[in-house]
């Protein structure tokens, strides 16, 4: 009986001891396990932080259709809002801004549209119209970035002069006709290819076209005209001579340029007969459609 009780107590003691050792095992490695848990938590926290971060775009207009152009517009509009109360003056000569092709190199390339370029010019001209006495370096330095970078000065139109005989030479064109005209002060004599005007041009309309520049400035009978014309028909030749006479009269008096330009004699007429297309009767006329 005693031996049986002792065996049971020993067995229970081993069980209790085994349970104590099983509970005590983690306590033996508590330091290393805590360090591992801390490292795991730190890595998890870092991964969470990195997963929530993103790259900040360099431009605030990154998500627009044309970020670079919009950045330029934002800067100019900020200056406009800052100096909107500054008085403006009427500018006689505007600086040479960057052309559309030149601005495209810094304004978005192929994304740049002509309307966006016009918007830029409007802001530049508005800032440039501020009174020069109140112009601040912030505005002038910003506008200088959009000036045309070239050392060449704009060429001025050189006025043509009369030759040694007091004649003015000009060349006019219309369709395939070319006219070389000499104009000199005289009694109103007009020769075309060494022939009189009435003899060379039979149609009254052609003769009136040649005299039209002189009528526009009230100078009929004050100039002698010698024309050499070739190519085209009679109407085209008459228009070519009219074009050349208008250009030659400007040499005598540059102040007549505005009046002649309004009369339309200084602008070349580029209209040509439209070519015939295959399958059509003429340039646009279609053959009559027949159902059957």
Swiss-Prot record:
Assigned GO CC terms: mitochondrial small ribosomal subunit
Molecular functions per Gene Ontology: RNA binding; structural constituent of ribosome
Protein family per UniProt: Belongs to the universal ribosomal protein uS9 family.
Subcellular location: Mitochondrion
Name of one Pfam family that matches: Ribosomal_S9
Keyword tags: Mitochondrion, Ribonucleoprotein, Ribosomal protein, Transit peptide
Name of the protein this chain belongs to: Small ribosomal subunit protein uS9m
GO biological process: translation
Organism annotation: Kluyveromyces marxianus (Yeast)
InterPro entries documented for this protein: Ribosomal_Su5_D2-typ_SF, Ribosomal_uS9, Ribosomal_uS9_bac/plastid, Ribosomal_uS9_CS, Ribsml_uS5_D2-typ_fold_subgr
Region (Disordered): 273-292
PANTHER family the UniProt entry points to: RIBOSOMAL PROTEIN S9, SMALL RIBOSOMAL SUBUNIT PROTEIN US9M
Main subcellular location: mitochondrion
Lineage: Eukaryota, Fungi, Dikarya, Ascomycota, Saccharomycotina
């Amino acid at each position: 009986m005693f031996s049986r009780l002792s065996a049971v107590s020993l067995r229970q003691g081993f069980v209790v001891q085994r349970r104590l050792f099983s509970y005590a095992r983690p306590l033996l490695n508590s330091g290393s396990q805590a360090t591992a848990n801390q490292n795991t938590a730190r890595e998890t926290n870092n991964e969470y932080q990195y997963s929530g971060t993103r790259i900040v775009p360099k431009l605030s207009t990154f998500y627009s259709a044309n970020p670079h152009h919009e950045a330029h517009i934002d800067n100019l509009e900020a200056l406009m809002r800052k100096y909107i109360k500054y008085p403006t003056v009427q500018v006689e000569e505007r600086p040479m801004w960057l052309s559309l092709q030149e601005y495209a190199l810094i304004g978005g390339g192929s994304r740049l549209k002509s309307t966006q370029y016009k918007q830029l010019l409007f802001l530049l001209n508005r800032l440039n119209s501020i009174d020069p006495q109140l112009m601040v370096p912030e505005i002038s330095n910003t506008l200088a970035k959009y000036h045309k970078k070239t050392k060449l000065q704009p060429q001025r139109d050189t006025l043509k002069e009369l030759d040694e005989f007091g004649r003015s030479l000009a060349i006019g064109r219309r369709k395939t006709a070319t006219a070389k005209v000499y104009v000199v002060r005289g009694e109103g004599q007009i020769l075309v290819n060494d022939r009189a005007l009435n003899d060379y041009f039979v149609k009254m309309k052609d003769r009136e076209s040649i005299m039209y520049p002189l009528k526009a400035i009230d100078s009929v009978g004050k100039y002698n005209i010698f024309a050499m014309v070739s190519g085209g028909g009679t109407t085209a030749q008459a228009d070519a001579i009219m074009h050349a006479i208008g250009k030659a009269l400007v040499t005598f008096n540059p102040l007549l340029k505005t009046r002649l330009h309004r009369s339309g004699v200084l602008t070349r007429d580029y209209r040509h007969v439209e070519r015939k297309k295959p399958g059509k009767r003429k340039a646009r006329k279609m053959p009559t459609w027949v159902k059957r």
